[in-house]
Amino acid sequence: MSDYKFTLNLPETEFPMRGNLANREPEMLERWTKDGLYQQIRDSRIGRTPFILHDGPPYANGSIHIGHSVNKILKDIIVKSKTMSGFDAPYVPGWDCHGLPIELKVEQKVGKPGQKISAAEFREECRKYAAEQVDGQREDFIRLGVLGDWQNPYLTMDFATEANIVRSLSKVIENGHLHKGVKPVHWCTDCGSALAEAEVEYEDKTSPAIDVAFTAVDSKAVAVKFGVSDYSHSVSMVIWTTTPWTLPANRALSISPELDYSLVEFVKDGVTHAVILADVLVEACMTRYGAESHSVLAKIKGAALELVRFKHPFLAFDVPAILGDHVTTDAGTGVVHTAPGHGQDDFVVGQKYGLEVANPVGDNGVYKPDTEFFAGQHVFKANDNVVALLKEKGALLHHVAYRHSYPHCWRHKTPIIFRATPQWFISMDNHNLRKQALSEIEQIQWIPDWGQSRIEKMVENRPDWCISRQRTWGVPITLFVHRETEELHPDSVSLMARVANRIEQEGIQAWWDLDAAELLGEEAEQYRKVTDTLDVWYDSGSTFASVVAARPEFHGHGVDLYLEGSDQHRGWFMSSLMISTAMTGKAPYKQVLTHGFTVDGKGRKMSKSIGNVIAPQQVTNKLGADILRLWVAATDYSGEMTVSDEILNRSADAYRRIRNTARFLLANLNGFDPKNDLVAVEDMVALDRWAVRRAAALQQEIIEAYEQYNFHIVTQKLMQFCSIELGSFYLDIIKDRQYTAKQEGHARRSCQSALFHIAEAMVRWIAPVLSFTADEVWQLLPGQRDAYVFTQEWYQGLQSITLDTDLSDAYWENLLTVRNEVNKVIEQARRDKRVGGSLEAEVTLFADATLTEQLTHIGDELRFVLLTSEAKVLPLVDATSDAVETELASLKLVVNATTAEKCERCWHHREEVGTIEAHPTLCHRCVTNIEGDGEVRLFA
């Protein structure tokens, strides 16, 4: 054999079988950075149609987690696939840099501002801390193979961005959407600040649930309203609440105008009580109160009780019964304790009736000094004292510990309160902002489509947006308000423009350093500077204006796509929509795509306490970023994304299949020069033409899946192509021709041309997902080419040629089915020790007329398709008794061991081996391939 070994075209490539990604990827990243790859991509797309994916900024605090990785990888896949489709798709990563979490970290290090350190120094420390966090996260994101302008990202703390945030607010003000008001807002007593909706989490909490009687000022008159005259007992209206601490701020009792309310007399412990309850809740209440007996004296509609007055249970004033649409009968009594300073519904109904917005609670959650009974007590600790006082006053009908869902601070994980404070708001209704936003939502493509109804409900129900915070590290609300009237300065918009110019030069500290007289002159004494800062959701929500509209690489194009986790419907998607609609009347995006959260193999959230956290850094260090990227792409992101070591190992197995396919392609393109050796598709061997045609059809499907952001379909189709059409069929069949045909002959060059086309297409298909591997393949592909696959477009060399004489896809699919049946019978023969390998087999195919015509069409080349040394086709009716039935009714098979000698070079068993004097160990075909013009192949 040694004489003939060197006549074979054995595969050869520098592309290793093992990816060794964890070690090789960092080397590739160094080259990408050194070569300025991102800029090369930008230069390759000058003048093309822009596609703008705007990066929602992660918070500059802590290490990235698996959810961050999912988000960045999905974005990168889209940007790379859009670039491959010819778009100019810049990617500018960003970071959210202001706000409370950074303040808390800096406080731990240097103390609170104004104590050991000035506010200005504190801000500088916050800026430094945020910059350090950005650097750490940036390295981790780059390691994932995400291409972008990493050296010039946007930071919400950049002076220019801070200035643009102020300019955006001035436009909101100019359009009439800002107002100041005393309103109940989510308030964290630990933060000492208002919280945005997105900063509130709901957790279970145990609270005292109490039923409290408010006695009527004139019980007889109330009884008369029910049609009961000369009634001698006191009549009370009963509320049920889980926040006893809010009772000092009670200013009304809300009832539903449409509900029936009953006057109920009941006896407990020998004492008669008369109470007003929603009729449908009477039985439940009587059971709860432990009534020994009860009777309903009369019923009336709630509307008849409007403005009836009742005594506060422990304060020296009375309160009205008022009508509210927020009253339900899900629980309680059908009467709602109403404290306008401590609840949004209470506030709204209170405004209608002109109620006082009482707020006896300070920033720290402690009752103010003038609060009767409870001064100096923390509200949650005061609950028990309120209950005790109610009991003492005879107003407590029932008390029980009650477990329920309650709002908590996202940062401190502690219960929060609703508290009325003077704040700045973007009004949802003053200038039809809500209506405009709802109209805009309909113009946007939401992916998945349930995102639309989700954000619609949120916009329909959301209160005015409280955009002010009482913090140190944030973009200032750069307003001057009159010291007496609290009115905004009439020139606020132009003043803000001047302040923004200063901030652009000096950063936000410029506002606190500013002497009002510099801008206001003599008016300065009449006005004071606002000291509040902006909600950080305003910072990030305005980046469509402060970043995208401001940076030249976006060409003033506007944003095509926002892509974030599904929690951002109430976060970044919402804040961006509100600000953009308030500024321009239009939404800031055309498409919004959301992905699910990552959970472990059992569907649980990632948690350090459970020990199920999978850190992206560990995955890249062990398996490589391409394995993580393949998992992200292969997972349907519309739901929860399940990840575990086992799942990642499965991704690694799938990756190996793709890598092995790429290696086969490269190894068999050894010595192929497309400039000189490429065979035109119409001149190819029929099977090669089929392979190119399949690749062309697949490319269309893959491009379509990329365009629809269905990356799991891309990976499914790719895996099927590598495993079935290539691995189990085409590549298996062509090995013989590739290795044994004449090196320069048509049979081999046809095959190599098909492999070249497939490799050129496939390297582009995988580039958005398996970026490192695609680069590795690209560097080893034959022919002259640009430095990087990432500057390319989808491969144009695939032609879906259909010649009149061509064998159809259906023909080859039938042949694949026949081949599978033959393989089964040969495998059984091997198990029975009748044959060794398939080349030791002679197969006889007994086929019906239709199948016979197909099988004989390719003549002697059928044996190459079946990988046997001999293949005979005979009529089905002539099937011998030993013929094996197959799953095809049209086919029976007989497999026998060949008696012919084995060719030393190609290993086929042929009758002529031993008859050729010059080459006694070779078959005719091999002699022709060594000494002659090479064998002729037409079909396979």
UniProtKB/Swiss-Prot annotation:
GO molecular function (one): isoleucine-tRNA ligase activity
Residues annotated to bind ATP: K608
CDD domains: Anticodon_Ia_Ile_BEm (cd07960), IleRS_core (cd00818)
Residue numbers covered by motif 'KMSKS' region: 605-609
Chemical reaction(s) catalysed: tRNA(Ile) + L-isoleucine + ATP = L-isoleucyl-tRNA(Ile) + AMP + diphosphate
Compartments (UniProt record): Cytoplasm
Positions of Zn(2+) binding: C903, C906, C923, C926
Manner of cofactor binding, per the entry note: Binds 1 zinc ion per subunit.
NCBIfam families: ileS
Assembly mode: Monomer.
Protein name: Isoleucine--tRNA ligase
Organism field: Shewanella oneidensis (strain ATCC 700550 / JCM 31522 / CIP 106686 / LMG 19005 / NCIMB 14063 / MR-1)
Classification of source organism: Bacteria, Pseudomonadati, Pseudomonadota, Gammaproteobacteria, Alteromonadales
Gene: ileS
